[in-house]
Amino acid sequence: EELAAELPGSFIAGQFENPANPDAHYRTTGPEIWSDLDGQVDAFVAGVGTGGTVSGTARYLKEQQPSVHIVAVEPAASPLLSGGKAGPHGLMGIGANFVPKNFDRSAVDEIVPVREEDAYAAARLLVRAEGVLAGITAGAALWAAGELARRPEFAGKNIVVLLPDTGDRYLSTPLFAE
């Protein structure tokens, strides 16, 4: 904001509070998922960074089918969304240590806290088993989706998990140290 005050005509995107963020996912991500799966979406899992992806996508999917189960993923070490306290964590991309204005809690059915080591394990499994070089945040979302898939009520159901980051930015981190 200080820089914007100094630079006439500048623009601050404000990704944590700008309603264009969830609206973009309402207009694009949600319809793409719905169309690609011919409306056969039983659950949607996404990490919460700005809150825009999960909130906008959830709003669209729930308009199509109110029973779609929406899962928001947050760091277990900083479980603000589920009523805990902010804390340091290594899940870059989610868990901003405040509740973003763009996070619509009413659109979410469940919040799953994920431990750093579980996110790392899921990201490593994804690269080893599928050849998908995903990042830490993707690992967290995948781990949460796996937990959901193990529940009897989700057996045989279509669970969509959004993998928001690539692993190339983590090659020199503990994620790929093994």
Region roles according to the model:
Residues 4-9, 63-136, 174-178:
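Active-site/ligand-binding loops adjacent to catalytic centers
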Residues 7-48, 105, 117-132:
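Active-site/ligand-binding-proximal alpha/beta "capping" segment
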Residues 11-13, 45, 71, 112, ...:
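Hydrophobic/aromatic beta-strand patches that form the interior of the parallel beta-sheet core
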Residues 17-20, 49-52, 74-79, 85-86, ...:
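Glycine-rich beta-alpha junction loops
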Residues 35, 59, 63, 143-151:
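Short, well-ordered alpha-helices that flank and scaffold nucleotide-derived cofactor binding pockets
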Residues 40, 63-72, 148-158:
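Phosphate-handling active-site elements
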Residues 47-58, 137-145, 170:
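Short glycine/serine/threonine-rich phosphate/pyrophosphate-binding segments
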Residues 146-178:
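Phosphate-binding loop/pocket of nucleotide- and phosphate-handling active sites
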